[in-house]
Amino acid sequence: SEKLILKIQKERICFDDLSNRNILLDLISFFNYEIAMFLDADEYLDVRFSNLSSYLSDNRLAYLIPMVNLWDSEKMFNAEYPYSISGISPRYRMFRNFGHCQIQSSKRLHFQQVPCVQNATVASEILVLHSGMLTDEMRKQKFERYLKEDTENCQSSYEHIRPKKCPKLRSVEEITQEELYNLNIR
């Protein structure tokens, strides 16, 4: 199947993730697509769990994509990440084309990144690896950026990414198809 990757660059006034995603939604409205997924520059698909085509024929409008935050190694992830299930965080990131749409949120940060959440399920054949907190230095930069940029208190705390934290880690290789499938049951 064909893939289209869109990247935008705009003048940065402040970190406004909502505006960025809505600009991308404006752009993709000119294309005939079946499903779309938001992936950030520091995120990539685990090759074992990257079957996007399995979602082309169902009737779901939105999908929660399992995601892990890599920590100190590309082979390990933070198993104690807040709002996760053993370190796996299902996030709204993939959705079906239903015409021009926008994400509605009162927050600029930490919102559901799809225009519609009705008729949703976990995409258990996909796993996103987030490398944005891989090193202590990266976590320090992210921690400081969020403290500065999150003027609306979109998230109650960023202590979980504070530098020098030593959470319990799990191997990415330990994640099984069954574990991802069981995210739908919870």
Where are these regions (language model features)?
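Short beta-strand-to-loop acidic/aromatic patch adjacent to the donor-nucleotide binding site
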Residues: 32-46
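Active-site nucleotide-sugar/metal-binding loop of Leloir-type enzymes
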Residues: 22-35
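Acidic donor-binding segment of Leloir-type glycosyltransferases
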Residues: 1-14
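A near-ubiquitous, low-amplitude feature marking generic local secondary-structure context
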Residues: 7-8, 35, 77, 129
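Catalytic-site signature of metal-activated, phosphate-bearing donor transferases
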Residues: 17-22, 44-186
